[in-house]
């Protein structure tokens, strides 16, 4: 039986493709069982290289089966088909953070603070459970229809991590969100990598643009070392700028932990942004 026919018998009606990777695509679908719209990630293991099938995919599935957090995407079920395809049925989202910024521009201070507090809480949960994401970026932060609630998604580069000396060597994620040590090919603490990426996400949220020009990747660490600049005339609280500076410290050891980020004074209610 084909995968699409099996999905139909299970009460799913596949719709348009809303995302596509090298070995997978994400489709929107309606579900009789869950009485509404879901997202289904379709992974074609036959087209994928052994490294993906034997290492990265099992890690992703292990994380998705084990995590339970209000700001991490929830998976309803996994459907394996004998033709090599795997269907991951999960929560659907109205949009993502990148689309919201592209559509509306920078996110106002209070809303940005509230959204980032949710992101920080989700990353702290992962790190407390010895898990890392390693691909935090605006596209992987899903938003509710009112753009007030977030869900982290896409754990394709996720793995277990128990901190130093449990270092990573795999280049993961997008260059624009990659920390200096990752770009330089140095064995890195993946938790500190996540923290750096959080800094890039926060900068994009509050400015509407990227902190560093990534058109020349070889020169990117040099620009990162100089620190960030802000668009002229941008109104942004000193507490927010201070947090971004902490997250984007060139030295990994100088960056805060995810727990420290979640407790940062800017994230306390009352700071207007």
Swiss-Prot record:
Its cofactor is Mg(2+). The lineage of its organism: Eukaryota, Metazoa, Chordata, Craniata, Vertebrata. Serine/threonine-protein kinase component of the sperm flagellar doublet microtubules. May act as a regulator of sperm motility by mediating phosphorylation of sperm doublet microtubule proteins. Plays a role in DNA condensation during postmeiotic chromatin remodeling and histone-to-protamine transition during spermatogenesis. Its EC number is 2.7.11.1. Its main location: cytoplasm. One of its GO terms (molecular function) is protein serine kinase activity. It catalyses: L-seryl-[protein] + ATP = O-phospho-L-seryl-[protein] + ADP + H(+); L-threonyl-[protein] + ATP = O-phospho-L-threonyl-[protein] + ADP + H(+). The keyword Transferase applies. It comes from Homo sapiens (Human). Belongs to the protein kinase superfamily. CAMK Ser/Thr protein kinase family. Autophosphorylated. Ubiquitinated; HSP90 activity negatively regulates ubiquitination and degradation. Highly expressed in testis. Expressed at lower levels in colon, small intestine, ovary, prostate, thymus, spleen and peripheral blood leukocytes. One of its GO terms (biological process) is protein phosphorylation. SUPFAM superfamilies: Protein kinase-like (PK-like) (SSF56112). InterPro entries: Kinase-like_dom_sf, Prot_kinase_dom, Protein_kinase_ATP_BS, Ser/Thr_kinase_AS, TSSK6_STKc. Transmembrane segments: none annotated. Microtubule inner protein component of sperm flagellar doublet microtubules. Interacts with HSP90; this interaction stabilizes and activates TSSK6. Interacts with the heat shock proteins HSPCB, HSPA8 and HSPA1A. These interactions appear to be required for TSSK6 kinase activity. Interacts with TSACC; this interaction is direct and recruits TSACC to HSP90, which is essential for kinase activity. The gene is TSSK6. This is Testis-specific serine/threonine-protein kinase 6. GO terms for cellular component: axonemal microtubule doublet inner sheath; nucleus; sperm flagellum. Keywords: ATP-binding, Cell projection, Cilium, Cytoplasm, Cytoskeleton, Developmental protein, Differentiation, Flagellum, Kinase, Magnesium, Metal-binding, Nucleotide-binding, Nucleus, Phosphoprotein, Serine/threonine-protein kinase, Spermatogenesis, Transferase, Ubl conjugation. Residues 12-267 form the Protein kinase domain. It is an enzyme of class 2 (transferase). ATP binds at residues 18-26, 41.
